[in-house]
């Protein structure tokens, strides 16, 4: 009788343990999925969350032009209060502008999990190809000479670029020159060259009412002439001017963060904001859908 009772109790205990293990596996599966991508940062994204500052606190460091070579200094925005590492982004302002013109976007990107250096150029009148060289120098500074607190947060193997106007033209040029970059985001870009042979994934932001770099002469030809094998997206801001990137802009925030997250962090959670887009804030949207596959 005691043997029968022991076997019954043992069977009941085993069944309970198996049920508990199954429950634990189901409960843990989202975490397991998240851990499969070592670069995934932050909670599951929503569109509204991408229009505001993200989950990370942000520290800043001012880079004196006297302490660097190859570019004119600038401001670094980087996540703090964490031991994680993050991809790096160098950003160039436009013609006659300085780093303050993109301060909002630099901080926004950092708050969502990037180390961002918004540069000042050697001269406010530098043309796009000079800005490309300065973006390259800025990335090298981030990797090798930035403060230890910054380098402790930087994953130097995951780098990207962005820029406004002539800085956007410089962004296209450096993307052509440096195929190791993970992503490029030219904002209302300007360049006399319309063809850039790059394999770096490119998101181009145009502005419908741009009279400085009209989209028909700049942003759209840039997009059209990128190789068909290159992941590419063109978004056109409805009724926006050339200077839309210089102030807080919800659409720029959503698409820039999403593009950087997808390609710098390999975070496919952000595809939802870049595929099958129907956005009233845009007057045009184009893509070859290579990022949606």
From Swiss-Prot:
Main location: secreted
Disulfide linkage: 275-292
Signal peptide: 1-34
Activity regulation, per record: Is inhibited in vitro by diethyl pNP-phosphate (E600), but not by EDTA.
Practical applications according to UniProt: It was also shown that biologically recycled PET produced from enzymatically depolymerized PET waste exhibits the same properties as petrochemical PET, before being processed into bottles, thereby contributing towards the concept of a circular PET economy.
Temperature behavior of the protein's activity: Optimum temperature is 50 degrees Celsius with pNP-butanoate as substrate. Optimum temperature using PET as substrate is superior to 70 degrees Celsius. Shows 70% of the maximal activity at 30 and 70 degrees Celsius with pNP-butyrate as substrate. Has half-lives of 5 hours at 50 degrees Celsius, 80 minutes at 60 degrees Celsius, 40 minutes at 70 degrees Celsius and 7 minutes at 80 degrees Celsius. Is thermostable, with a determined melting temperature (Tm) of 84.7 degrees Celsius.
GO-annotated molecular function: acetylesterase activity; cutinase activity
Enzyme class: hydrolase
Keywords: Disulfide bond, Hydrolase, Secreted, Serine esterase, Signal
Family assignment from sequence similarity: Belongs to the AB hydrolase superfamily.
Note from the entry: The gene encoding this enzyme comes from a leaf-branch compost metagenome. The source organism remains to be identified. However, it is presumably a thermophilic bacterium.
Name listed for the protein in its UniProt record: Leaf-branch compost cutinase
Protein species of origin: Unknown prokaryotic organism
């Amino acid at each position: 009788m005691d043997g029968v009772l022991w076997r019954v109790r043992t069977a009941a205990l085993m069944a309970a343990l198996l049920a508990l293990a199954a429950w634990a596996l189901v409960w843990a599966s989202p975490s397991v999925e998240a851990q499969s991508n070592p670069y995934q940062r932050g909670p599951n994204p929503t569109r509204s969350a991408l229009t505001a500052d993200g989950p990370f606190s942000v520290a800043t460091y001012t880079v004196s032009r006297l302490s660097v070579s190859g570019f004119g200094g600038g401001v670094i925005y980087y996540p703090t209060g964490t031991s994680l590492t993050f991809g790096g982004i160098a950003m160039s302002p436009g013609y006659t502008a300085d780093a303050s013109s993109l301060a909002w976007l630099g901080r926004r990107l950092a708050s969502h999990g990037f180390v961002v250096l918004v540069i000042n150029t050697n001269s406010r009148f530098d043309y796009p190809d000079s800005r490309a060289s300065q973006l390259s120098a800025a990335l090298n500074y981030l990797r090798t000479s930035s403060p230890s607190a910054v380098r402790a947060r930087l994953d130097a193997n995951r780098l990207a670029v962005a820029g406004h106007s002539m800085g956007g033209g410089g962004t296209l040029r450096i993307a052509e020159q440096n195929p190791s970059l993970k992503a490029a985001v030219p904002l209302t870009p300007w360049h006399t060259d319309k063809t850039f042979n790059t394999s770096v994934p490119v998101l181009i932001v145009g502005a419908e009412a741009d009279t400085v770099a009209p989209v028909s002469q700049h942003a759209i030809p840039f997009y059209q002439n990128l190789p068909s094998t290159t992941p590419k997206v063109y978004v056109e801001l409805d009724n926006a001017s050339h200077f839309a990137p210089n102030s807080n802009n919800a659409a720029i925030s959503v698409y820039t963060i999403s593009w950087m997250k997808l390609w710098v962090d390999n975070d496919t959670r952000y595809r939802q904001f870049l595929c099958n887009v129907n956005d009233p804030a845009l007057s045009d949207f184009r893509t070859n859908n290579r990022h949606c596959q």
